[in-house]
């Protein structure tokens, strides 16, 4: 199996989209989902950009993720058309869009494809000096991630040692 050809990388939220752009530049199949039009501008004319209408960040309210997914049918339809065998979700757990959407999107993919896809998550941890609410979001997001069945692998990135400009 050729890894690049059989992998779809999905960036959720600003951090996830920035990292996913690096993979797009290397020729991987990618999708980007964020509610902030300003954040999406840094992606330029990449293919697979999904503006989550009505959700310019979740303002720390991660529970809005399911509502967001239901309100953005274009994104869910794109998730239902993924041909690649491996799906990698990249997102920051300290924010709200990526951390809120991560478990919901992973579960949605699992519900659509069952065991036919390999789901891998790549959560980016906040820096030590970030606000306490970012660490609270991280804890909640990781708890949700741990409760999901069907995630084949998780690779944590330390934001302290991984700067993406």
Where are these regions (language model features)?
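Tubulin/FtsZ superfamily GTPase core signature
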Residues: 1-165
